[in-house]
Amino acid sequence: MNMLNLNGLKIYQINFMKNILIIAIIFFTLSCNSNKTIIKDKKAIDSLVTNYIDNGSQALLLVWLEDKKGNYIYKFSDKNNNLVPNQNINENTWFRIWSMSKIVTISITMDLVEDGILKLDDPVSKYIPELDNIKVALTKKGTSLTSYIQNPENDKSNIDNPCPLKIIDKKSEMTILQLINHQAGFYYATTGIDCLDNGLIIKNLADSKNSNEFIERLSDLPLIDQPGNKDFYGLNTTVLGVVNERATGKTLDELVKNRITEPMKIKGLQYNKNVNTELLPVFSGADSIIRLANQGELDIMGKYVPGYGIDNELFFGGEGMIGTAN
């Protein structure tokens, strides 16, 4: 949901995250200055969380805070029983963690850098030669699409519609660091530029059989800007995951297990579901209030969610993981 361009929902999420951050800072400060965590009014904190269920901005929430030893110092959950009638929400509930997958993928990349397998200034084409000749899209006037999108006046009128796009050659080398910093030029189908978004949606990237097919489809699409020119949120970390795979000869799923979850004995973070894993429904805030998502409503790159099946062989480093709080 954080990838949708929904102003009302964004306001809810920003305010929610501010309040949760305040809670986290309070607990962090207390735990650093005392041998025991002091909670003077747990009900007041619970009420703060519940408010986001009651006002319709969230379908469910789980807040789980731990100290540095891994002991929980606060936990609370709530849900909209009409939207989630049959599932209990607790530390063992499996969530699609969406863009939090990016942190895991980047951590693996930095681990590979430490091992001398990757360098941050390596060209991406060293590992993904299919992207060496990728093109760059401009507005029909030949100006930058990122500049067009970031101009608020362009959201209010179709007078300066940038379509049809002008396609030019890539002028700079794309690097691994640019993938990490979202400066490589990739995007989601949420730019608001129909001729750009529709091209990505038609490719249905999430329906690729594996990362090779994903790259084959992606390489036909233009970048939204020259690599290194501006940061723009999108599929950059997903491509970074493929770099990790190509550099090691292992799948991203294997890399997560070998370098993170198994050494650290983490059981609640993975790609594919287990046999008995039940995922929560997918929700949308398209109407400025949370509800069950309609088919294709979260259409950020074609099919609106990655595959989570046991036999899935496509691992999205930017969107595809599932996890629990515990």
Say what each PLM segment does.
Residues 1-3:
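Methionine residue identity
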Residues 18-23:
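Sec-dependent signal peptide recognition
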Residues 30-31:
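C-terminal motif of bacterial Sec signal peptides marking the signal peptidase cleavage site
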Residues 39-95, 117, 133-140:
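Short, conserved catalytic-motif segment at the N-terminal edge
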Residues 49, 69, 96-124, 237-245:
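Active-site SXXK
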Residues 55-57, 88, 119, 168-173, ...:
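Extracellular/periplasmic catalytic domains that process cell-envelope and extracellular macromolecules
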Residues 134-326:
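Short, surface-exposed loop or secondary-structure junction motifs
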